[in-house]
């Protein structure tokens, strides 16, 4: 069992998937092209749901692509070896995904017209989702309790480092025309509105019936049951009994798991780390 991290420039990555050589390539040699579309998230923020929506927008709601090709081939991960190789060989407009923090991302992005969609989720729900995810998969250090994981998370001692630094870094681009910020909570509350917002950002005009197909085939239950999207094809030796890649897909599940003391400790760190953002910036506040 690979239970430790590959550390790269101060950020921990799950050792099974990441070597320093792969990360060197992804962060320093990868060249972003003008017509690229990049989906960026911190882990466990709704990444697969967003990929599914974007794929369906590109096919105007036709589900054939999402039902026939694994999600990691439709939108390869820049920072994995296989994803990096696929992307460097890919012709035409590329769709890609990354969890990389801003300071590690290829500098070629910042002088390009490539479009970026950055999805943010309430970090308390991210934490709970990550706790259940990592406890069932053989890729990372296992916390002995949720309390331990809260401590790790608040210190940034988890895969891809600090949520707070990740968000602060990427949100510095929020005024750029080619950078769209979405919130998981807003997407859950008004999925169709979010689909239309993504269409506008991408310059895609979909008819009402096509928008309805995007909505239908990107629903949590449909994505959870799609073997091309739910990671059921993942190698069995990585998965422990009881694993499900997509667990609940809800908001505010953290309230079912945090103690009062944990909630207070989290709030204190959140206020300190996210000071300076305008009031009402985050929909869960």
UniProtKB/Swiss-Prot annotation:
Detected in liver. It catalyses: an alcohol + 3'-phosphoadenylyl sulfate = an alkyl sulfate + adenosine 3',5'-bisphosphate + H(+). It comes from the Eukaryota. Keywords: Cytoplasm, Lipid metabolism, Steroid metabolism, Transferase. 3'-phosphoadenylyl sulfate binds at residues 44-49, 121, 129, 184, 218, 247-249. Pfam families: Sulfotransfer_1. The keyword Transferase applies. One of its GO terms (cellular component) is cytoplasm. Induction: Induced by estrogens and suppressed by androgens. Expression is under the influence of pituitary growth hormone and thyroid hormone. It is an enzyme of class 2 (transferase). Gene3D superfamilies: P-loop containing nucleotide triphosphate hydrolases (3.40.50.300). GO terms for molecular function: alcohol sulfotransferase activity. Its EC number is 2.8.2.2. GO terms for biological process: steroid metabolic process; sulfation. The active site is at 99 (proton acceptor). Belongs to the sulfotransferase 1 family. PANTHER family: SULFOTRANSFERASE SULT (PTHR11783). Sulfotransferase that utilizes 3'-phospho-5'-adenylyl sulfate (PAPS) as sulfonate donor to catalyze the sulfate conjugation of a potential wide variety of acceptor molecules bearing a hydroxyl group. Sulfonation increases the water solubility of most compounds, and therefore their renal excretion, but it can also result in bioactivation to form active metabolites. This is Sulfotransferase 2A2. The gene is Sult2a2.
């Amino acid at each position: 069992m690979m239970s430790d991290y590959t550390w790269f420039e101060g950020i921990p990555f799950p050792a099974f998937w990441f070597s320093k050589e792969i990360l060197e390539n992804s962060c320093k040699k990868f060249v972003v092209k003008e017509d690229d579309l990049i989906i960026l998230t911190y882990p466990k923020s709704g990444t697969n749901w967003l990929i599914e929506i974007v794929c369906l927008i590109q096919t105007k709601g036709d589900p054939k692509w999402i039902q026939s090709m694994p999600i990691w081939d439709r939108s390869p991960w820049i920072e994995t070896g296989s994803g990096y190789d696929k992307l460097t060989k890919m012709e035409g407009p590329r769709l890609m995904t990354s969890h990389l923090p801003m300071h590690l991302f290829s500098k070629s992005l910042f002088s390009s017209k490539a479009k970026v969609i950055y999805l943010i989720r309430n970090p308390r729900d991210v934490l709970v989702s990550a706790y259940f995810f990592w406890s069932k998969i053989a890729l990372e250090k296992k916390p002995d309790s949720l309390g331990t994981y809260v401590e790790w998370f608040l210190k940034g001692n988890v895969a891809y480092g600090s949520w707070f630094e990740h968000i602060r870094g990427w949100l510095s681009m929020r005024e750029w025309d080619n950078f769209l910020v979405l919130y998981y909570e807003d997407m859950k509350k008004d999925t169709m509105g979010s689909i239309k917002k993504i269409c506008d950002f991408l310059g895609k005009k979909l008819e009402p019936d096509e928008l309805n197909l995007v909505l239908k085939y990107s629903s949590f239950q449909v994505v959870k049951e799609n073997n091309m999207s739910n990671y059921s094809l993942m190698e069995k030796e990585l998965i422990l009994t009881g694993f499900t890649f997509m667990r609940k897909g809800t908001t505010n599940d953290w309230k079912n798991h945090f103690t009062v003391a944990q909630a207070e400790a989290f709030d204190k760190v959140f206020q300190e780390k996210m000071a300076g953002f305008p009031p009402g910036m985050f929909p869960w506040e």
